[in-house]
Design a protein with these regions (language model features):
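Acidic, glycine-rich two-metal-ion catalytic cores of nucleic acid-processing enzymes
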Residues: 1-87, 149-228, 243-251, 282-291
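Catalytic palm active-site di-aspartate
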Residues: 39-40, 109-111, 115, 132, ...
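Catalytic palm subdomain of template-directed nucleic-acid polymerases
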Residues: 48, 104, 110-124, 229-246
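Short, amphipathic alpha-helical "recognition" segments used to contact nucleic acids or chromatin
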Residues: 95-104
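Extended, well-ordered alpha-helical scaffold/bundle regions in very large, multi-domain proteins
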Residues: 105-150
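Short, conserved secondary-structure transition motifs
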Residues: 138-142, 261-277
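Flexible helix-coil linker/hinge segments at domain or subdomain boundaries
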Residues: 251-265
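Acidic, low-complexity intrinsically disordered tails
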Residues: 270-295
Length: 295
């Protein structure tokens, strides 16, 4: 397990395809209500910055700019403004993005090269990927040290603890199969980060539910999906509910970057697809057709 909440039964909310608006669009609010969803923004990297105490990585969040553009700008010393990185240096931004998401899962140069080549539509050499990873860890040296320290601890002990003290046993680190042992180590490191994000989300949901009950708002949280909280809220209470949820999620529980609480993204709509169904599909008579992409 990764330390996140799990879901099972006839309605397994966590197995709803994330990018399928047909299925998500079936979850609709009744008249007079809205579905409100809140996601933690770039949660895994935010909490990696917290746990590693890497000031350079924390500075990326306090800067307030696009995360991946800021990372690329810092790592590759790009001669442009951060806001222009996405347009002028898309390959470098894709590289920074692939490394950021990959390091917590133990991705090496080969995986980074494949990811960037596919995303940017260019040939991205293995040697370049390794150079970029080296440059990344030169800039974020404390993150590198934290990853190394956690790896050594897990390999030596066969367990790890979440930020709030839950023990995750990892017996397969002692496997004679190096592939299994390596996967177990990666799972342990990833669990430390994901469990913290999940716990913060859960504490925020509990505090919000209690405050909603106290204030007698017509709102009910009906599912938590990884880093998101989804609720059914009466139209008259949507604005207040959103403020309460954001405030409770961003409370400092001892795991926040100073002066920069975790970011949140909120969506409000008639259904769980939040209008994406209408952007992707059209109904002509009884026939459902996909709208051609303009990209």
């Amino acid at each position: 397990t990764s330390g996140r909440l799990s879901s099972s039964g006839k309605f397994n909310a966590q197995q709803i395809p994330r990018d399928n608006p047909i299925i998500k669009g079936c979850i609709k609010a009744p008249p007079g209500y809205k579905i409100v969803s809140q996601d933690l923004a770039t949660a895994e990297m935010y909490y990696a910055a917290v746990l590693s105490a890497d000031k350079n990585l924390q500075a990326v969040f306090t800067s307030g700019g696009d995360f991946h553009s800021t990372i690329a700008h810092m790592v590759f010393n790009l001669p442009c403004k951060v806001e222009d990185v996405k347009e002028l240096y898309s390959a470098e931004r894709q590289s920074a993005k692939a490394i950021s998401f990959g390091i917590l899962y133990g991705s090496g140069a080969k995986k980074v090269a494949e990811t960037v080549s596919k995303a940017a539509g260019i040939e991205y050499p293995l040697e370049q990927a390794q150079e970029d990873i080296n440059a990344y860890f030169t800039k974020f040296s404390k993150l590198k040290k934290w990853l190394k320290d956690r790896k050594e601890f897990i390999e030596a002990n066969g367990y790890t603890y979440s930020f709030f003290g839950r023990k995750r046993r990892l017996p397969n680190v002692f496997s004679s199969d190096k592939g299994i042992a390596s996967h177990e180590v990666r799972s342990g490191i990833n669990a430390e980060v994901q469990s913290l994000a999940s716990d913060v989300n859960l504490f925020g949901a509990i505090a919000t539910a209690n405050e909603v009950k106290f204030k007698k708002l017509d709102a009910k949280i009906f599912m938590l999906v990884h880093d998101s909280i989804v609720a059914l809220v009466a139209d008259k209470d949507v604005e207040e509910y959103c403020e309460i949820l954001k405030r409770n999620t961003q409370k400092n529980l001892g795991c926040s970057i100073q002066g920069c609480p975790i970011g949140v993204d909120q969506e409000i709509g008639e259904d769980y697809a939040f209008g994406k169904f209408e952007k992707v599909y059209t109904l002509e008579g009884d026939k459902l057709s996909r709208i051609p992409s303009r990209e």
